[in-house]
């Protein structure tokens, strides 16, 4: 469909019977209205032509061959002569055969049937709106019991038994047998209601605004009562409140979209265009048919049988009529969603029929495989690897992929700069991989974002835009912080690259889809760009160090490789003196010169506020110098004091990994603060 803003879109929802009839019916030039499928036949076994009023009827769905009717007559399509535009003998219009891809038909159901998606799927929308248990509604739909109608004070059959609603289980066999078909219809239409028609009546009587008001009042009352002290009762109250919220949201959605609740019960069943459920002839003259055709045939057979029972037969028991209505309901359920009520229906080879739900849902369904998963131009695909040196909003594209994606832009750049006279010369330069080609490619990529998508796209962060840069190799480089949004890791995952072409798409990619603009989860608001995968391992290795404290490391034989300034005593103990550094640059320089390791403990001079130091903490050791100065050694810091107990300096006990991690955090915070100050 196309909305008022000329956006092509697809929407799945409920439609009225009038809308279904408008889609499926058409008036041929002689004034006859066609569109209803009344026969369960497909092709005639002798002539191999579609049966009239059948599932492949050319009067309803259009000719099989363009401009040729069922009789074999031919007319030129679009001819402005006064010849009739349809065959007066067979009633087939002379139109293009492509009409069979979108022209629908319909089946007029003798009895209403509920749409199984809205009854059996969780949550059950019909049960939520009616505020009744799902099992009770199922028993009503499949004619297991009935409801009593509120009628006038006239004498009724049900008054003989009082409350019919609670005694129907013992009466469900006696009542249909008591009446003939004609009498049973009078009785049922006047005093009881059963089947999908009962659901339709109850849905039609609903006032959605009153439902919202009553649900809100009940929700407030439950909230004011507070906990009862009984855990089971409290859970029931919480579940009831959640149900009321869902019911109000559902009623608001029906009001907002102008959908009537009774549309969840079908009176007209749409028939798909025949090209979407084809019958194909294979080798040996055998025919292969779509499973949907067989399911449609079953619906038509049972619907016609019910019509015959109600119109031709006068002595059929009412129970048989109710049984046939149940069969029609089950046939429509199987057509829409096979197996939703239990065991799926199978063919003669014990193969499960593919229903309408099976055709459209899942990885191999119509949407994901044909509409979303099909190959498109200006797209590529490759394995992703980590790019730790990339910025958050950048991705690395291999040269092979980039030159294919941006080939048209590179050709235009070569021609504009008079480096190529025509498209053929430009393509030859690209094939030869001349240096000027890569320069123009980099210029093009600087102003053109790309979209990265990882299947399955379960939320909007499954597609994000990045600024591409050229990298060597044949893999796509990705910043590890964006992995959580894609639910990706680097164990062989693949991602697709798409190039937005229109200005609107590029603007949307820059303003809404850039990775650095999607730092929070749109669902719950939690940070989505958090360290994962290799970043967590790297941070752990960087900041691990030793966990056993200063006492355990005084004479630790495991630290033999940590230091160059080591002293060995005759007592077989190894004393490892921890080095002192005045600043972080000296410590990192010593690490680069391989004088210390990444996790080697060291003392770093630091400007530490003494108010942070606990006054009750007692030093582990005190070292005195010859001039009276002394060192107070604590678990994580060291204080150098004079004879007069004045503090000269403070050292903290850390590692090179901690120093590097702190410097990275400090630079990031300073850069963020500067960016915020520029914005303000």
Curated annotation (Swiss-Prot):
It comes from the Eukaryota. Keywords: Chloroplast, DNA-directed RNA polymerase, Magnesium, Metal-binding, Nucleotidyltransferase, Plastid, Transcription, Transferase, Zinc. GO terms for molecular function: DNA binding; DNA-directed RNA polymerase activity; magnesium ion binding; zinc ion binding. It catalyses: RNA(n) + a ribonucleoside 5'-triphosphate = RNA(n+1) + diphosphate. Signal peptide: none annotated. Its main location: plastid. Disulfide bonds: none annotated. It is found in: Plastid, Chloroplast. Mg(2+) binds at residues 489, 491, 493. Pfam families: RNA_pol_Rpb1_1, RNA_pol_Rpb1_2. The keyword Nucleotide-binding does not apply. One of its GO terms (biological process) is DNA-templated transcription. GO terms for cellular component: chloroplast; DNA-directed RNA polymerase complex; mitochondrion. In plastids the minimal PEP RNA polymerase catalytic core is composed of four subunits: alpha, beta, beta', and beta''. When a (nuclear-encoded) sigma factor is associated with the core the holoenzyme is formed, which can initiate transcription. DNA-dependent RNA polymerase catalyzes the transcription of DNA into RNA using the four ribonucleoside triphosphates as substrates. Belongs to the RNA polymerase beta' chain family. RpoC1 subfamily. This is DNA-directed RNA polymerase subunit beta'. It comes from Nasturtium officinale (Watercress).
């Amino acid at each position: 469909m196309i909305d008022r803003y000329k956006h092509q879109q697809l929407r799945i929802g409920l439609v009225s019977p009038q809308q279904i009839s408008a889609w499926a019916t058409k008036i041929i030039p002689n004034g006859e209205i066609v569109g209803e499928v009344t026969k369960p036949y497909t092709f005639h076994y002798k002539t191999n032509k579609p049966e009239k009023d059948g599932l492949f009827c050319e009067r309803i769905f259009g000719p099989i061959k363009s401009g040729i009717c069922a009789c074999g007559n031919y007319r030129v399509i679009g001819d402005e002569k006064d010849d009739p535009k349809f065959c007066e003998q067979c009633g087939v219009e002379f139109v293009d055969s492509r009409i069979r891809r979108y022209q629908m038909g319909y089946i007029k159901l003798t009895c209403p049937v509920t749409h199984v998606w809205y009854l059996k799927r969780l949550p059950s929308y019909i049960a939520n709106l009616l505020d009744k248990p799902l099992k009770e509604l199922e028993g009503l739909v499949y004619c297991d019991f009935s409801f009593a109608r509120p009628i006038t004070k006239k004498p009724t059959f049900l008054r003989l038994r009082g409350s019919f609603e609670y005694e129907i289980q013992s009466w469900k066999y006696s009542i249909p047998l008591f009446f003939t078909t004609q009498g049973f219809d009078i009785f049922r239409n006047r005093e009881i209601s059963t089947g999908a028609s009962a659901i339709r009546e109850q849905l039609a009587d609903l006032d959605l605004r009153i439902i919202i008001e009553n649900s809100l009042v009940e929700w407030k009352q439950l909230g004011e009562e507070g906990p009862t002290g009984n855990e089971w009762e409290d859970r029931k109250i919480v579940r009831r409140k959640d149900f009321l919220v869902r019911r109000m949201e559902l009623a608001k959605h029906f009001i907002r979209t102008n959908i009537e609740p009774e549309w969840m019960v079908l009176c007209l069943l749409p028939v798909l265009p025949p090209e979407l459920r084809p019958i194909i002839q294979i080798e040996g003259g055998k025919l292969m048919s779509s499973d949907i055709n067989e399911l449609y045939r079953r619906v038509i057979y049972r619907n016609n049988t019910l019509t015959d029972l109600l119109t031709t037969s006068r002595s059929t028991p009412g129970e048989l009529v109710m049984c046939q209505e149940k069969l029609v309901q089950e046939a429509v359920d199987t057509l829409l969603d096979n197996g939703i009520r239990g065991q799926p229906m199978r063919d003669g080879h014990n193969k499960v029929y593919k229903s309408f739900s099976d055709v459209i849902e899942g990885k191999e369904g119509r949407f994901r495989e044909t509409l979303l998963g099909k190959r498109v131009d200006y797209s590529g695909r490759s394995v992703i690897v980590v790019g730790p040196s990339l910025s958050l909003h950048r991705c690395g594209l291999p040269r092979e992929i980039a030159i294919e994606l941006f080939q048209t832009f590179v050709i235009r750049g070569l021609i504009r700069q008079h480096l190529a006279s025509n498209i053929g010369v430009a393509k030859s330069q690209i094939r030869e991989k001349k240096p000027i080609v890569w320069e123009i490619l980099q210029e093009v990529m600087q102003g053109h974002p790309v979209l990265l998508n990882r299947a399955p796209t379960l939320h909007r962060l499954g597609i994000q835009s990045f600024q591409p840069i050229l990298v060597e190799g044949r893999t796509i480089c990705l910043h590890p912080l964006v992995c959580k949004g894609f639910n990706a890791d680097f164990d062989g995952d693949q991602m697709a690259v798409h190039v937005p072409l229109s200005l609107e798409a590029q603007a949307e990619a820059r303003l809404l889809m850039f990775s650095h603009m999607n730092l929070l989860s749109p669902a719950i608001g939690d940070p989505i760009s958090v360290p994962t995968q290799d970043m967590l391992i790297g941070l752990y290795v960087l900041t691990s160090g030793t966990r056993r404290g200063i006492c355990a490391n005084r004479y630790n034989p495991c630290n033999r490789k940590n230091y160059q300034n080591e002293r060995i005593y005759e007592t077989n103990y190894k004393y490892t003196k921890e080095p002192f550094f005045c600043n972080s640059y000296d410590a990192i320089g010593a690490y680069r010169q391989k004088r210390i390791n990444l996790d080697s403990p060291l003392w770093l001079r630091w400007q530490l506020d003494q108010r942070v130091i606990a006054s009750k903490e007692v030093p582990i050791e005190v070292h005195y110098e010859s001039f009276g100065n002394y060192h107070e050694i604590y678990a994580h810091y060291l204080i150098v004091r004079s004879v007069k107990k004045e503090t000269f300096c403070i050292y903290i006990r850390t590692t090179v990994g901690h120093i590097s991690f702190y410097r990275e955090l400090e630079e990031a915070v300073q850069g963020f603060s500067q960016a915020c100050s520029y914005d303000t």
